[in-house]
Structures are given as structure tokens and as C-alpha cells.
Regions:
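C-terminal coupling/interaction segments
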Residues: 260-297
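ABC transporter nucleotide-binding domain
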Residues: 172-259
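ABC transporter nucleotide-binding domains
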Residues: 5, 12-188, 193-201, 205-207, ...
Length: 297
């Protein structure tokens, strides 16, 4: 399956703080791609670089095979976005808020406003002032705004933030509808494990600005992921090993976390020993929740 979005070796630092540290991943056309990590992991920074809101220090971002051009509105219109807790004019109606966006665009058919409001089940409330909307309604209005330019890809940053369980379920249903009926690829950022598990077919896990895992959700859940804790100071050796073999990893208190196949654990240990990297614990993690917690704690 062809990729719609490719991110390669992305870096972003603020003074001495590495917000994003050498992140690479790809999103296939038609995916609902989960972006999972704790608060402060670097999720929002990465997504804002893709959207052109933040300039990366280095790295490559490609959309449909072409390098991004943030000065090109045609490129920007290919990506819709719901930024966490979208802001609207509270004293204006939903329709009036979207009409402002329409007036600043090159869109030629004003019926698009009713179309996107209907898509998010707000058409019958389009004349109501946004100040009276619930948080869930505001989130849906944000998605309507993201759909205005009929993008091929939408990025949703914490779309279920602040919603009750029913609101979260409604949001998942809406995202699935957009993905299947409009054939829009979705990147969804969340720290809610169940949200990613229930809706995404592929995902990335990041922590402290680094990628620690990527793959199909069911494979990450069913595969055996191991925790490696070294007993020597050969940190550089194991990091170089992981990079050479393209194994995502993170380093926490002299422990290294990476994903590996159960049937090949002995093969991995022998290979590491051949590099003079001694191990004194190999622990298997079974569930997505346990996997996530051990990767990010």
C-alpha cells in the first residue's frame, strides 16, 4: 500500500531540550494511524511540524511523495487539522464561524458549509451560538472546519480530550465514518490507550521525543515485547546495535525497551552477547497497556 505521509529523521529542540529526537514513520493511504504517548512525549510538536505551524530543525516531511512546501496553500489544503481544544468565536453561530473561514479561502461553493456540518451532525444546530455548545460539539465543529477543503489527510490532536465515555464513543464513530465514507486518511494523537486500540489499524509509540515502537496495532498487542536491562556501561554499543538493525528503543535508567519476536529472543541475546553487551534481565510484556506503560514510564 502506498504512503500518503512520510516523516524521516525529524528533529526539533528548544535550547537544550530535545522535543523531537530523530523520529521517522510513514502513514499509508486509508490508514487510521494512532499517535500514542504520554503528555509531553512530543506528539503535538511532531504534528505541528507536519502542519507547518512549527519549523523543524532538520528532517524530511513528504506528502504524497513530494517534499512539503509550507508556502504553498495547495499543499496546506491537502491536510485538515483539529488542534486540541479548538477555539471559535463564542458569540457567533457554527455556520457564521465556518463562513469566516470560507470567505478567506478560494472555495467557490458555499454549500460546503452545510455539507461538513451535516457530516458531524451539527446541521440542525448551525444557527446556535458556539458559546452554548458542549465540549463534544466544539470538537465536532473543529472536525467540520478540518473538512472544509476536502483534504486527503486529517490530523486530530486529542479529539476525545475532555469528553465523557459516550462522547468518546461518538467521536470514534465519527472518525470511522470520515475514514470509510470520505476515504480520508486519519492521524489521531492520543494518550488514551483504549481510543487508539479501538480505532487505529497502525500506530506509533513515542516517549521523550523518540520513537519506541511502530506497527500494526494487533501485531503490537499480540507480539512479545521485551525489556532489556544492561549490566555494563556499554550504552553506546546497544544504541548503535538498535539503530543498525532498525529496532526502535528508549533508554530509561540503564534499561532499554524494544519490540521483538518471542521465537527469536535467544537469537537476539546471542547477537547482543557477540557485541559484548551483557544482559541480566529479559522480560516479556504481553498487553498493549503493559507494553505502553513499560515503554513510557
Amino acid at each position: 500500500m502506498s504512503s500518503i505521509l512520510e516523516v524521516k529523521n525529524l528533529h526539533k529542540s528548544y535550547q537544550n531540550f530535545k522535543a523531537v529526537d530523530d523520529i521517522s514513520f510513514h502513514v499509508n493511504k486509508g490508514d487510521i494511524y494512532g499517535f500514542l504517548g504520554p503528555n509531553g512525549a512530543g506528539k503535538s510538536t511532531t504534528l505541528r511540524m507536519i502542519l507547518g505551524l512549527i519549523k523543524p530543525d532538520s528532517g524530511l516531511i513528504q506528502l504524497d511523495g513530494g517534499r512539503v512546501d509550507y508556502s504553498n496553500k495547495k499543499y496546506l489544503n491537502q491536510i485538515g487539522a483539529l488542534i486540541e481544544r479548538p477555539d471559535f468565536y463564542k458569540n457567533l453561530s457554527a455556520y457564521e464561524n465556518l463562513k469566516i473561514l470560507y470567505s478567506m479561502s478560494k472555495l467557490k461553493d458555499i454549500r460546503i458549509i452545510d455539507d461538513v456540518l451535516n457530516e458531524v451532525d451539527l446541521l440542525d444546530r448551525k444557527k446556535d451560538k458556539v458559546g452554548g455548545y458542549s465540549q463534544g460539539m466544539k470538537q465536532r465543529l473543529g472536525i467540520a472546519q478540518a473538512l472544509m477543503h476536502q483534504p486527503s489527510l486529517i490530523i486530530l490532536d486529542e479529539p476525545s480530550n475532555g469528553l465523557d465515555p459516550q462522547g468518546q464513543a461518538d467521536m470514534r464513530e465519527l472518525i470511522l465514518k470520515i475514514n470509510t465514507e470520505r476515504r480520508i486518511t486519519v492521524v489521531i494523537s492520543s494518550h488514551i490507550l483504549s481510543e487508539i486500540e479501538k480505532i487505529s489499524n497502525r500506530m506509533i509509540v513515542i516517549n521523550k521525543g523518540r520513537k519506541v515502537a511502530e506497527g500494526e496495532v494487533n501485531q503490537l498487542m499480540s507480539s512479545d515485547s521485551i525489556k532489556i536491562q544492561i549490566k555494563t556501561d556499554s550504552h553506546t554499543a546497544i544504541e548503535n546495535y538498535c539503530k543498525t538493525h532498525q529496532i526502535p528503543f528508549t533508554n530509561e535508567n540503564e534499561s532499554y525497551y524494544l519490540q521483538w519476536e518471542e521465537a527469536k529472543i535467544n537469537e537476539l541475546i546471542k547477537s547482543l552477547n557477540s557485541e559484548n553487551i551483557s544482559l541480566y534481565e529479559v522480560r516479556q510484556l504481553k498487553t498493549l497497556e503493559e507494553y505502553f506503560l513499560n515503554l513510557t514510564n
